[in-house]
Amino acid sequence: MGILNRWRQIGRRYFWPHLLLGIVAAGFGVPLLPGGGQEMLYQADNCPSLSRQSAFQAGFSQLARLKDVPCRTTYAVDYWHQHAIRTVIRHLSIAWAPAPLPEAVAPLRVQHQVLLTTLGLLLNREARPPVLVRRLRSTGHVAFIDNRSGIRLTQQQGIRAGPHAAV
């Protein structure tokens, strides 16, 4: 029984927070790159023809740059995504509790505040449902479907699944 409690504690402390952080990162569309993301950011700024997914590779430290990137049009925060964001905000708020820090670590605190503010804004953003596209004008042309070959096959070979001739 002791080993089951240990596995449960490991899952609660390590697995679920990292999984939820991955869900939130996937919702941002921001893959976490430990290094080498700066060159791609420079290319994304200078080359408009590169796609968003391949060119804009940023980590959590460049969240302010996400406002310039066009978002997905069908993006909406559903219930489980909101739950994941709330849990990550709770974990990060506890982990990054204010403490007396030296001046050299002050920019890191600013990044933490930007991340928490961005997650809070994402959580409170009103989701727009996808817009229905309707045909604006209808055409009077109806395609003619020629069923004569099917009728001929049903008469010659006795196929019952084809169209029936009303003779």
UniProtKB/Swiss-Prot annotation:
Keywords for this protein: Cytoplasm, Periplasm, Signal
InterPro entries recorded: SecM
Subcellular localization(s) per the UniProt record: Cytoplasm, Cytosol; Periplasm
Gene Ontology cellular component list: cytosol; periplasmic space
Signal peptide: 1-29
One Pfam family recorded for the sequence: SecM
Molecular-function GO term, any one: translation regulator activity
Keyword Cytoplasm among record annotations: yes
Primary localisation category: cytoplasm
Keyword field contains ATP-binding: no
Function of the protein: Regulates secA expression by translational coupling of the secM secA operon. Translational pausing at a specific Pro residue 5 residues before the end of the protein may allow disruption of a mRNA repressor helix that normally suppresses secA translation initiation.
Similarity-based family: Belongs to the SecM family.
HAMAP family reported for this sequence: SecM (MF_01332)
Protein name: Secretion monitor
Species assigned in the record: Sodalis glossinidius (strain morsitans)
Gene name for this UniProt entry: secM
